[in-house]
Regions:
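Conserved SAM/SAH cofactor-binding pocket of Class I
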Residues: 60, 64-145
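Hydrophobic residues in well-ordered beta-strands that form the structural core
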Residues: 41-42, 111, 180
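S-adenosylmethionine
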Residues: 114-218
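A short, charged helix-loop
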Residues: 52-58
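Active-site beta-alpha loop architecture of Rossmann-like, nucleotide-cofactor-dependent enzymes
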Residues: 47, 63, 159
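Conserved beta-strand segments of alpha/beta enzyme cores
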Residues: 10-12, 39, 108, 133-135, ...
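N-terminal auxiliary segments of SAM/dcSAM-dependent transferases
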Residues: 1-48
Length: 218
């Protein structure tokens, strides 16, 4: 291209000082607090006296609490009784939701993600938060065959949720709870129809900047 007379390319360059990008990232990574009860922070943040203090090293994984969907799922978890509830965190990302579920008394807990980075990061974060009841798996909804849960948390996206909805319903115990997020307000009708047509009952929802987190019971 450089030798082709039909192309004219102008460019400039400059030297920049060597930068510690981890340090720069840390400067811009802020801890968050949800409903005055749950504090989510990175390892370099000071610990607080929050009722639930979660330490997350996100690396390449989704789930620091900053995104609207994670924030709303935390809200759902905070107002739900998880004591001795067998729980599934589907599409666990950093395992932040599984960690909070254990802090609220859930056990045992399965955390599943199809992404290898998320799988490894979830193991690290579970250990970092001294979790004893979380088992992390790399895979998809095919791992759910024969499983049964009292509570299922699935923060993924519209298409995957719709595709896997029957598996969620099949492994949800009677009177079990299904939390869904990862989609927009305009997706509520199709998500709700998929759930109710399979025997679930709508309970409530949170909305935040056009994102939604729904709660259903079986």
């Amino acid at each position: 291209i450089l030798d082709n007379p039909e192309f004219k390319i102008n460019y400039t360059f400059e030297e920049i000082e060597q930068v510690n990008w981890n340090e720069e990232w840390e400067k811009n990574f802020e801890a968050i607090e949800v409903d005055g009860k749950c504090h989510v922070r990175a390892p370099f943040h000071e610990k607080t006296n929050a009722e639930y203090d979660i330490v997350i090293e996100p690396k390449m994984s989704f789930g620091t609490g900053h995104h609207e969907t994670t924030h709303m799922m935390i809200q759902h978890i905070l107002e739900t009784d998880f004591s001795n509830k067998k729980t599934l965190d589907m599409g666990c990302g950093t395992a932040i939701l599984a960690i909070l579920a254990e802090m609220k008394g859930a056990q045992p807990i399965d955390a599943i993600d199809i992404d290898n980075w998320c799988y490894l990061n979830s193991i690290e974060n579970a250990e970092r938060n001294n979790c004893k009841h979380i088992s992390v798996y790399e895979g998809d909804a095919s791992l759910l065959v024969g499983k049964k849960y009292d509570i299922i948390i699935a923060n993924i996206n519209r298409n995957i949720l719709l595709n896997d909805m029957q598996q969620y319903v099949d492994c949800l115990n009677d009177n079990g709870i299904l939390f869904l997020s990862g989609f927009y307000t305009e997706d509520i009708p199709v998500i709700s129809e998929s759930c109710t047509s399979k025997g679930l009952t709508y309970v409530k929802q949170f909305e935040r900047n056009n994102w939604v987190a729904l709660k259903f019971v079986k």
